[in-house]
């Protein structure tokens, strides 16, 4: 069963919603104080609207992984241009074009079968073709599947710690 990586097209919204809801259930089970299962009401239609609105945007990337005619996963990313005044910043990478992965989700039944790898490698190739010097993404720090995938399989390194505090 091979995976095909392609831009999303009309009709993919239902499959994208299915994968997103599955990811929500997985993460809500890991940490219910932080994650929730998204509302399914109108979700497929929301994905369809996003497909129509952003399919040909220059600095935004949307990819779908298809296996046997079904959406198996998807990825969204965007380019960030060098920051104004980057020479005055402490962080060197602010002077670079950066590929920011906003979301990468794969149907749980297809984990460890190359779908996430194919999506992320396609995004990296897209970024290289647009002069990106690095890729950045974030994931749940205690994710037992995602963290090893990024660090051990894909060669990503932890670069910072993200803090949060509820107010009220």
Regions inferred by a protein language model and the residue ranges of each:
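A short helix-loop-beta-strand connector motif used in the catalytic cores of GNAT acetyltransferases and
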Residues: 48-63, 82, 100
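Conserved acyl-donor/pantetheine-binding loop and adjacent beta-alpha core of acyl/acetyltransferases
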Residues: 76-100
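Conserved N-terminal entry element of GNAT/NAT acetyltransferase domains
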Residues: 1-14, 18, 22-25, 29
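Conserved beta-strand in the GNAT
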Residues: 64, 70-78, 100, 105
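Conserved beta-strand-loop-alpha-helix junction that forms the acyl-donor binding cleft
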Residues: 111, 137-146, 164-168
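Conserved GNAT acetyl-CoA-binding A-motif
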Residues: 120, 127-139
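Conserved GNAT-fold acetyl-CoA-binding loop/helix
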Residues: 21-50
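Conserved acetyl-CoA pyrophosphate-binding loop and the N-cap/start of the following alpha-helix
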Residues: 110, 114-122
């Amino acid at each position: 069963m091979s995976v095909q990586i392609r831009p999303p097209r009309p009709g993919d919204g239902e499959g994208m919603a299915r994968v997103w809801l599955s990811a929500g259930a997985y993460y809500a089970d890991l940490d219910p104080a932080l994650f929730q299962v998204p509302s399914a009401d109108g979700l497929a239609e929301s994905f369809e609207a996003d497909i129509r609105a952003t399919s040909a945007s220059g600095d935004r990337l949307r990819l779908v992984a298809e296996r046997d005619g079904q959406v198996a996963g998807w990825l969204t990313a965007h380019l960030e241009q060098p920051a104004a005044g980057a020479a005055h910043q402490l962080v060197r990478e602010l002077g670079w074009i950066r590929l920011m992965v906003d979301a990468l989700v794969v149907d749980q039944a297809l984990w460890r079968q190359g779908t996430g790898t194919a999506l992320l490698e396609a995004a990296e190739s897209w970024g290289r073709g647009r002069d990106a010097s690095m890729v950045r993404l974030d994931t749940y720090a205690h994710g037992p599947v995602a963290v090893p995938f990024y660090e051990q399989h894909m060669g990503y390194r932890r670069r910072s710690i993200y803090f949060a505090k509820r107010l009220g």
